Regions:
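A mid-to-C-terminal "edge-of-domain" accessory segment
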Residues: 77, 88-89, 94, 160-161, ...
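Non-ligating segments of multi-cofactor redox enzymes
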Residues: 313-314, 321-330, 334-375, 409, ...
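Iron-sulfur cluster-binding cysteine motifs and their immediate structural context
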Residues: 352-357, 388-412, 439-466
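C-terminal substrate-recognition/cap domain of FAD-linked oxidoreductases
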Residues: 82-90, 94-297, 305, 310-313, ...
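Short beta-alpha connecting loops at secondary-structure transitions
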Residues: 120-124, 236, 286-291, 322-331, ...
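Iron-sulfur-cluster electron-transfer modules
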Residues: 228-232, 419-505
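Flexible glycine/proline-rich, aromatic-decorated loop/lid segments
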Residues: 155, 159, 223-225, 275, ...
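FAD-binding subdomain of flavoenzyme oxidoreductases
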Residues: 1-132, 143, 350-360, 364-375
Length: 505
């Protein structure tokens, strides 16, 4: 969440895990019998983990490097912090899985500790004319009882229609406590820090639940709003970097200037400033070589800024993926990267789990194999394929999910436009009839969890309408029903009442 930082992230609260490895072996690290069985069946893995642990601990320079890198949020590459944090090989294996993105095994179950939920909290939106001063304020607040501090740059504020002022930077802060008295003391301590800064408006802390909800709705609304206003046919890319807190003012201003210099005038920067962790959003087209070059140049400069200048994290929360795979060794250095590769080979010697993710020998993999987003249907063109809709899709797991329907329809549209593979086009169109069309409930539940509020059912209705031939029997029945709704409704009611009457004893 907004306040987990590094002290309460998934690695810190993880207790045990049920893992399925590449060879099909199942290990439950929280079960003594499972651990003993794994020792007997895979002694080479246990010994390998212990050997890596001992070599890491014997290298003071590497230990220092690892601790420094994980002092801030960092998920670039594999999580090698367990080698200095834990001694038991099963604990190390458990925590190696965190952030591994399916490259080491499948986590089917896990046990985590819960955090304390404070009953009282107070929030305030702090506005600054200058981004640097906003960041300097965050640095100063770091030593106060602040729970979280979220930065929203001018584009972020504009996207959610904040009318406080023009070209402002905001910091949304929150503090929490077990008692009202402690909460008041926390607010007073934070207000004392704020006295040293030039705020655009007087800060107003509120503990009213409705007001608090409005503040945090603004923060939550940035990504879907910005993504929803991107030009059609472009991909929304949200990157995720982190700096050490003392570098925050300089690094934030450098990042903002870099995005502007590379032509990303509509980009926005927001995120967990208290942890030095920012997300920046860009709308990127990959249609031309110039588009690809623009993106390549930006990523090259980002790596120089984050790694060379500030020794930060190229990935703080979202995972390495393919986009940052070529830069893992650059960030970590050869020794740490060698440890990661050794772990990968130990747990997945045949490289069958998510190949190309985190570890990729192609230095240009981040500018290859782009997924096109052709204009397909006005109801779905804003889709960014995040998959949030799938939890409410009735056919997900049976045939296709709402996201998969959109992906397939985009591929059909692309094949129609390019004409490159007519056989594949016909196959997709034929298979979609059942998997995509007939099994779609078209009830719109998918839109309730979609950040863009996209109703894939509207797409299905369009496709079904298009499939009905004019003057066909189906078309005539549809026309008749549309022209005689009251009579049909009455007839259905009468039929239902008759059935009820017949079924009564």
């Amino acid at each position: 969440g907004m306040s987990c930082g590094t002290h309460a992230n998934s690695d810190k609260v993880l207790k045990s895990m049920r893992i399925v490895f590449a060879d099909g072996t199942v290990l439950d690290t929280g079960d003594a019998d499972s651990r003993n069985a794994f020792k007997q069946s895979h002694p080479e893995i246990i010994k390998g983990i212990e050997d890596i642990r001992d070599r890491v601990l014997a290298d003071d320079e590497l230990v220092k490097r690892i601790k420094h890198k994980y002092a801030i949020k960092n998920v670039t590459g594999l999580n090698i912090y367990p080698f200095v944090e834990h001694t038991d090989p099963f604990d190390i294996i458990t925590h190696l899985m965190v952030g591994s993105e399916g490259t080491l095994g499948f986590a089917s179950e896990f046990t985590m500790t819960t955090g304390h939920l404070y009953p009282y909290s107070s929030s305030a939106m702090l506005y600054f004319k200058d981004m640097r001063e906003a960041c300097e304020c965050v640095v100063a607040l770091k030593n106060s009882p602040v729970e979280c501090a979220e930065l929203l740059d001018k584009k972020s504020l504009a996207s959610v229609n904040d009318t406080t002022g023009d070209n402002l930077t905001a910091i949304l802060v929150r503090t929490s406590a077990d008692t009202k008295e402690q909460l008041a003391a926390n607010v007073a301590a934070m207000e004392k820090v704020l006295e040293g800064f030039n705020l655009y408006v007087q800060p107003k802390f509120t503990s009213d639940p409705e007001e608090n909800a409005k503040y945090w709705a603004i923060r939550s609304g940035v990504f879907p709003v910005v993504a929803g206003t991107r030009p059609l046919g472009t991909t929304v890319i949200i990157e995720d970097i982190a700096f050490h807190i003392e570098d925050l003012p300089d690094a934030t201003c450098d990042l903002a200037q870099m995005l502007q210099d590379h032509g990303y005038d509509d980009s926005c920067i927001y995120g967990h400033a208290l942890e030095g962790n920012y997300h920046f959003i860009i709308a990127q087209s990959f249609k031309t070589e110039a588009d690809v070059k623009q993106y390549r140049d930006l990523m090259s400069e980002i790596t120089k800024l984050v790694v060379d200048k500030y020794d930060g994290s190229l990935k703080a929360e979202h995972g390495t993926g393919r986009n940052m795979a070529p830069f893992v060794e650059k960030e970590w250095g050869p020794k740490a990267f060698a440890v990661m590769k050794e772990v990968k080979h130990l747990l997945d010697p045949q490289n069958i789990l998510n190949p190309g993710v985190i570890f990729n020998d192609d230095p240009d993999c981040f500018v290859k194999s782009f997924k096109p987003l052709p204009l397909t249907n006005e109801h779905i063109d804003k889709c960014m394929e995040c998959g949030f809709c799938e939890v409410n899709c009735l056919s997900c797991g049976f045939t296709m999910s709402s996201r998969q329907r959109i992906v397939v329809q985009r591929e059909i549209a692309r094949l129609k436009a390019t004409g490159e593979d007519d056989a594949r086009l016909k196959r997709l169109q034929k298979q979609y009839v059942y998997y995509g069309n007939m099994t779609c409930a078209a009830d719109g539940l998918c839109s309730t969890s979609c950040p863009m509020k996209i109703n894939t059912g509207d797409l299905t209705h369009d496709l079904r309408n298009a499939a009905i031939k004019p003057n066909s029997f189906t078309h005539k029945v549809g026309d008749f029903c549309a022209d005689n709704v009251p009579a049909i409704r009455s007839g259905i009611k009468l039929a239902l009442l008759s059935l009820i009457h017949i079924s009564e004893p």
